């Protein structure tokens, strides 16, 4: 029985490596296994195989080498250590930095005090939250707690707090297995679009149609900003269009592991902020508030690039 478990452990490790290196989530039939076996889980499995009882040194060596290779591979692809740009002083309106806070609140039962405290701490220009729960009946309390912000609950529990003027509000579209909302903001040069996405996970459906649907809302505009819970790790092949036309903010200017879920464990990077080429990412931070949500919150500081650069 012990030998059988040891063999199953190795087979699982080899399957996970095959998924991470080659198969990925091209096909929905095996995508769930790709999502379930990220590099940190494979590293944990290889360490477990290294510590397997009643094995000699030579028998442990393959698992030990696999652990070292996986640790290097994971850290080299997940650890962000970008040099932050200096945040400029406020001069012309175009030069003012734009600070955005995003967080999946995981449907709180009442007023989310953790969220209120984080907004007060970070003072963003725009804060957006998905899975805001029954926030509609609490808008007055949120407005009272955060009087500097215009508070609005959009359909499908997307909550927006903004210090910027909303130039236009587009209808919320709800394609199969996903929700997203789009609105234009004014106050940092020309009006620019913001798309907030919440893609639902499903074991037997590919996430590509939903990701492509969200991408289509950007119209490939270089000033677009896309925020949300993609329920899809940054290693996914379905994010190729985003990688071609946009920059992921934490990868560009963050420090630390880019994974945002679950509960402080760096397993999957499913919460993203994508910015178009007209934006420079000055800083990106990640906050864990484990009593408030099993997702990390993301805070980014952007600035429009000068046309003369």
Per-range role (PLM):
Residues 1-92:
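N-terminal membrane-anchoring alpha-helices
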Residues 65-118, 169-172:
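N-terminal signal-anchor transmembrane helix
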Residues 100, 106-120, 126-309:
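Soluble catalytic domains of enzymes that build or remodel membrane lipids, polysaccharides, and related
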């Amino acid at each position: 029985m012990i030998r059988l478990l040891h063999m199953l452990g190795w087979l699982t490790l080899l399957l996970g490596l095959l998924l991470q290196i080659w198969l990925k989530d091209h096909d929905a039939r095996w995508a769930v296994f790709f999502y379930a076996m990220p590099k940190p889980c494979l590293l944990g499995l290889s360490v477990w195989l290294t510590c397997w009882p009643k094995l000699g040194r030579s028998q442990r060596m393959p698992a030990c080498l696999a652990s070292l290779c996986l640790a290097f591979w994971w850290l080299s692809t997940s650890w962000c250590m970008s040099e932050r740009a200096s945040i400029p002083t406020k001069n012309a309106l175009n030069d003012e930095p734009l600070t955005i806070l995003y967080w999946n609140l995981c449907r709180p039962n009442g007023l989310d005090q953790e969220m209120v405290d984080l907004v007060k701490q970070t003072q963003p220009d725009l804060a957006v939250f998905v899975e805001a729960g029954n926030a509609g009946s609490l808008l007055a309390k949120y407005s009272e707690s955060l009087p500097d912000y215009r508070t609005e609950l959009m359909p499908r529990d997307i909550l927006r707090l903004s210090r910027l003027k909303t130039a236009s509000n587009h209808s919320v579209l709800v394609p199969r297995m996903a929700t997203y909302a789009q609105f234009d903001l004014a106050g940092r040069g020309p009006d620019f679009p913001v798309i907030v996405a919440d893609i639902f996970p499903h074991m037997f459906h590919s996430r590509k149609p939903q990701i492509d649907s969200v991408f289509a809302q950007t119209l490939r505009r270089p000033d677009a900003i896309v925020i949300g819970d993609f329920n899809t790790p940054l290693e996914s092949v379905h994010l190729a269009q985003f990688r071609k036309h946009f920059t992921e903010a934490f990868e560009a200017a963050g420090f630390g592991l880019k994974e945002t879920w679950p509960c402080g464990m760096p397993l999957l990077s499913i919460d993203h902020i994508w910015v178009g080429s007209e934006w420079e990412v000055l800083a990106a931070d990640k906050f864990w508030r484990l009593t408030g949500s099993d997702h990390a919150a993301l805070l980014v500081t952007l600035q429009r690039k000068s046309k003369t650069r």
